[in-house]
Curated annotation (Swiss-Prot):
Comp. bias intervals (Acidic residues): 8-38, 135-183, 194-214, 288-300
Protein name listed in UniProt: Protein hemingway
Record gene name: hmw
GO terms (BP aspect): detection of mechanical stimulus involved in sensory perception of sound; motile cilium assembly; sperm axoneme assembly; sperm individualization; spermatogenesis
The species this protein was found in: Drosophila melanogaster
Chain residue ranges for the region called Disordered: 1-70, 103-309, 359-387, 544-585
Protein family according to the UniProt entry: Belongs to the CFAP97 family.
Amino acid sequence: MSGAGEHSDEESYGEESFEEDSESEVEVEEEEIEYIEPEESKPSDALLLGESDTQSESDVKEEFLSGNPHARRYLGARVVSYLSSSSDDESQVVITKTVAEVNQLSLRVDTPPEDETPSVRTLMPGSAHSRVKDEDEAEDEDDDEGDGENDNDNEDENDDEDAEVEEIEEEEEEIPGDEDDAQSDGSMGRQSADDSDEEEGTDVEVEQLEEDEPIVTAVCKKTVQKELPPPQKDIVSLVDASDNSSEHSVVTMCASGDETDNTLVKYPRLRKQQPLTAKDSQSLKEQEEPEEPEQPEENQTEEHMPTSQPDLARVRYLEQQMTQMSELIMKSFQINGGAPNSQAFEQLAMATEMLQQRSDRRGDTESEMSSMTETTMTSARSLGGGIPPLTMRMERSQEALLTTRSSKLPRPKCRCPSESDLIEHEQKLDMGHELPHDLAANFGLGEGYLVDECGQGDGLMRHPQQRKPMELNRRAVSGTPSTFNSDGCEYQINVSRSRCSNDKINYKNLGRKSFSFTNPQVREIERQNQILLRKMMTVKPTATIKASTSSIKINGPEKRQTPPAPRLSSAAVNRKKNQRQIDLDNDLLKRKLEAIGTRRPQFK
């Protein structure tokens, strides 16, 4: 433009007149705005001047009058401070997020806090800033066309901004915990960055957001990194993100996306993942392991109390528990009226064999078998020597089982053997048979006494081929621990056993099977029933049944078409026949009438 003015007088004259007009208009508007803005913004000036030691209003006026066009804009940026983005309101924001929520979400908000409120550079339609910016751009063009006065002024302003940024950093280093100063410094640094951007013209407007964001995050990261070292030195000052009163929480949440692992995750997790103490780990182990009521007693007696006597109160409590358990089982039989309850018996047998094998592993079986006739005190003494209290529990539970069977419970439907029958059978076993080495006399009464589900066996020798080996005929007593857990078993328990055997009498069925017939008659009837049942299972179905079913399927639609002739003797069938005929006649008449109506010409 200036080069063209050198060649032709007309162009230079046109340019000079344009320059004079534009300068006169701009100067008039500048003077109006200059008088309006300081009057409106005196209280906010006082606030900002109190908070930061930057340029005063008089310095800005002098700089503007000296020829710097950006000084007035910088004053306007400082004056028009939106209340919604001020540091006072940010300190009052209630952050209702716990540490876990902050760690999960990591504060991923789509709109950062800077975008929610209009920033200094946003141009509102009809606002003073839009006019100011247009005027400043016009002034930039005029200054470029004229001479290079403003270059020196711009350099001076850049120096001022660098000095301001240095002052901001010094303030942050001096007072790291002051929230208001940090917020105001961030806003001042942001505004100075905006001014340096606006010097570059229209290119800055295109890349406005791209250049804004790194500066803001840089300021925020400085505050975050300077806030972090105190928590490392002092463990007490760990700050929870949900603590609204702490300054650290507000400062570290300066911008979304700037939260690092150090700010959000590190310290709360350090508090949570403290090493377990010995007591805590011990309690955890005790919770994981299934409770076995005998183990703590054995550990105490073996390790800590080698010479002391066992706790008699605990022994009596265990005996009482077993008596109650046997009573419960017998009551369940009585309530069911002799119905099969095989699950309870299987659990009892599993528990019994597990206890026996555990005692065998400890090598105490011989001493237990030798103490069959010992009293309760001798068994208690053996307990003090490290033998688990198996024998005494079994003896007491056996006595409780016998007494509850005989005296406590009436037996209207249950055919369990009485106490006298058990004593007689025990005498027979002592006389004739030798007991197996691993069975006590009062533990199951030997392998000859076969316990069946209550009321299920009938005393008949039906299945001689199902005889089991000798060691599987165990008596299931109620001496199982109340908290027996079969998950802890390391071995497979085989509790299946034959209901009857062909050489031993099933003493469960000493009572009358049926009061209409004698026991030999009942046995004969059962034998005949078994023979008939085998015949019925072996006979194949006849072919006539198959033929009849197939003929029904094939001839079904044909029978519908030609129904069979009704019997004349049935009045109901005759009525149905007459009604059907009447319906057919009615349908025929309707068809005839419709045909006549269609053939007839209809006159309108």
